[in-house]
C-alpha cells in the first residue's frame, strides 16, 4: 500500500515529526535537498561539466529546500544559480538561515540571470498547500520556467498545482519530474496534476508512519505486486467459486452483457447467468456459450439461485428495465453491484423510491456497490459534471455515505470509497480504456471477485486495479489508440498469479 496525502495531512505529519519525534525542521529540509540532489546527480553526474542548474526559489520552506539544494550542488562541483521570487523580508526563518549559509558558496544569485543559459530548471516556489491562483511575479516566474529549454524538476509539487485535487490554479509549472517529500501528494496522481508532475519520486526525508500518531492518511493506492487475490480451492467445483447473476443488455445491447459476463468468468467466477432481453438469446449463447441464459421473466427465480448480483450494463431506461431494477432491489438482499442505466434510473424521478429503499437496505447491512462514471455521478448527486470531476474523491465519499455503500467513481483516475475509512485511488490503466464497453468489463470483474467471496471494498479496489492492468496489457498489444473493450476482457488475469 502507498499512502496519498493532502496538504493538511502532510503539514500535520511534518509537525508531529518535529514536535513529538524530535527531528528538527532544518534536518528535514537538509534531507529533502539531499534527495533532490541525488535525483539530479543520477541523471547529470556523467555530464556535470556541461550541466548548469537554475533554481527558482520562493520565500517559503519550499524555497528553502531549493536554496539548500543549490548549496549541495555547488559543493559537488555543479554550476548553479538561484533566482529568488518574492519579498525576502517575508521569508520564513529557515529560508533566511539557508540564504545566509548560501552566501559562502559559489552560487550566482543576482537578478540578471539569463534563463536560456541553463539546462536544468528547478521549481522551488510553493510546494504543498497552495490554495489560490498563481499571480503577479510568481505567474511570470512559472511562465519563464515553462519557456526554458532543458530538464525541468519540481520540488515536492509543481507550482500552480493544487496538492489535494491536481487542479491547475491559474498557471502551473510543467515538470519532467517531481521529487516529493515524505509521502506522495494526491494532486501528483490525480489529473491534470499527474501530467504536470511527470515522473514522480517519493523521497524518504525522515517523515514516516511513526509521524501519523494514530491519524493515518485518508487515501491510498496499490503498489505493483501488492494486490492479493483469493486462493483457489484445489478441490473446489464451479459452485465453490460462486454463482453470479448479471442483469444486462436490452434489445440491441447484447454486447454489454457479453463483455460483463466474460469479465466475470475471466476473473474467476464459477457460474455466470445472464438475464437479458429475449431478443438477445441467440447472440448471448453464441458470444459467450459458457454463460447460462435467462429472460426477464425468470429474474425472480434467478435471484434465489445467485450468490451475488449485478444490474445495469446496457439495460436502458424503459419500463422493463425499471421493473427489473425494482425486482432486484425489493426481492433480494444479496450483494448487489449497480452500474450504468441502473444508476441513471435511480437518479430519475421514477426511481426515487427505489433509491430510498436501497439507502435503507445499505443502512441495514446489505452489501451495495455503485460504479458511476462522472456523468452518472453528477445525476445521482445533483451536481454538475465539472464539480464532480474537480473533486472526485469528495464526491465519491458523499455517494458512499448517502447509500451506505462502496462507491467506485470512474474517471482517468478511478476512486473507490466506502462509507467509513480510507479511499483508494487507482493508478493502473491508460487513455485507451476510454472506449465503449470498458465500464461493462469492470462491472463483470467486480462481480466475479464478489462471487468468490471477496468483501465489497476489496473486490472494488482489486477489481479496478486488475481492470486497469488488463487495459495496460491491451495497450501493449494494440497501442492506446487501438484498445477495444473486448481486448480488456481478453487480457484479464494474463501474466497474473496470486499477486498482481
PLM regions: where:
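Small-residue (G/A/S/T)-rich helix-start motifs and N-terminal tracts that mark the onset
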Residues: 1-82, 92, 177, 188-340, ...
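Generic preference for hydrophobic/aromatic residues in regular secondary structure cores
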Residues: 108-109, 173, 416
Amino acid at each position: 500500500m502507498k499512502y496519498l496525502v493532502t496538504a493538511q495531512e502532510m503539514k500535520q505529519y511534518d509537525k508531529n515529526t518535529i514536535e513529538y519525534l524530535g527531528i528538527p525542521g532544518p534536518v528535514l529540509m537538509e534531507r529533502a535537498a539531499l534527495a533532490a540532489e541525488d535525483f539530479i546527480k543520477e541523471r547529470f553526474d556523467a555530464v556535470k561539466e556541461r550541466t548548469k542548474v537554475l533554481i527558482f526559489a520562493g520565500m517559503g520552506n519550499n524555497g528553502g529546500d531549493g536554496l539548500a539544494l543549490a548549496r549541495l550542488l555547488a559543493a559537488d562541483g555543479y554550476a548553479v544559480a538561484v533566482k529568488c521570487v518574492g519579498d525576502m523580508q517575508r521569508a520564513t526563518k529557515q529560508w533566511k538561515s539557508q540564504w545566509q549559509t548560501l552566501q559562502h558558496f559559489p552560487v550566482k544569485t543576482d537578478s540578471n540571470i539569463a534563463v536560456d543559459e541553463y539546462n536544468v530548471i528547478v521549481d522551488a516556489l510553493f510546494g504543498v498547500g497552495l490554495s489560490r491562483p498563481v499571480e503577479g511575479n510568481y505567474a511570470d516566474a512559472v511562465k519563464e520556467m515553462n519557456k526554458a529549454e532543458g530538464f525541468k524538476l519540481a520540488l515536492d509539487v509543481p507550482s500552480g498545482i493544487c496538492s489535494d485535487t491536481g487542479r491547475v490554479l491559474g498557471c502551473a509549472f510543467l515538470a519532467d519530474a517531481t521529487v516529493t517529500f515524505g509521502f506522495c501528494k494526491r494532486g501528483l496522481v490525480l489529473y491534470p496534476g499527474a501530467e504536470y508532475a511527470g515522473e514522480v519520486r517519493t523521497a524518504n526525508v525522515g517523515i514516516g508512519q511513526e509521524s501519523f500518531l494514530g491519524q493515518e492518511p485518508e487515501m491510498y493506492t496499490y503498489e505493483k505486486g501488492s494486490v492479493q487475490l483469493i486462493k483457489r480451492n484445489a478441490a473446489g467445483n464451479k459452485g465453490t467459486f460462486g454463482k453470479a447473476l448479471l442483469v444486462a443488455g436490452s434489445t440491441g445491447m447484447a454486447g454489454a452483457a457479453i463483455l460483463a459476463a466474460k469479465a466475470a468468468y475471466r476473473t474467476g467466477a464459477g457460474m455466470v447467468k445472464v438475464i437479458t432481453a429475449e431478443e438477445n438469446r441467440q447472440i448471448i449463447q453464441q458470444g459467450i456459450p459458457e454463460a447460462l441464459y435467462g429472460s426477464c421473466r425468470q429474474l425472480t427465480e434467478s435471484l434465489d439461485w445467485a450468490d451475488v448480483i449485478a444490474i445495469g450494463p446496457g439495460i436502458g431506461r424503459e419500463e422493463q428495465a425499471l421493473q427489473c431494477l425494482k425486482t432486484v432491489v425489493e426481492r433480494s438482499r444479496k450483494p448487489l453491484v449497480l452500474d450504468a442505466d441502473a444508476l441513471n434510473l435511480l437518479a430519475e424521478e421514477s426511481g426515487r423510491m427505489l433509491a430510498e429503499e436501497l439507502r435503507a437496505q445499505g443502512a441495514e447491512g446489505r452489501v451495495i456497490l455503485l460504479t458511476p462514471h462522472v456523468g452518472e455521478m453528477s445525476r445521482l448527486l445533483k451536481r454538475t459534471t465539472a464539480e464532480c470531476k474537480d473533486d472526485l474523491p469528495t464526491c465519491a465519499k458523499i455517494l458512499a455515505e448517502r447509500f451506505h455503500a462502496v462507491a467506485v467513481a470512474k474517471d482517468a483516475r478511478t476512486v473507490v470509497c466506502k462509507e467509513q475509512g480510507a479511499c483508494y485511488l487507482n493508478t493502473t490503466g491508460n487513455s485507451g480504456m476510454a472506449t465503449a464497453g470498458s465500464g461493462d468489463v469492470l462491472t463483470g470483474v467486480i462481480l466475479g471477485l464478489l462471487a468468490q467471496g471477496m468483501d465489497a471494498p476489496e473486490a472494488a479496489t482489486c477489481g479496478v486495479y486488475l481492470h486497469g492492468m488488463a487495459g495496460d496489457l491491451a495497450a501493449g498489444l494494440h497501442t492506446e489508440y487501438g484498445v477495444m473493450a473486448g481486448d480488456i476482457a481478453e487480457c484479464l488475469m494474463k501474466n497474473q498469479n496470486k499477486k498482481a
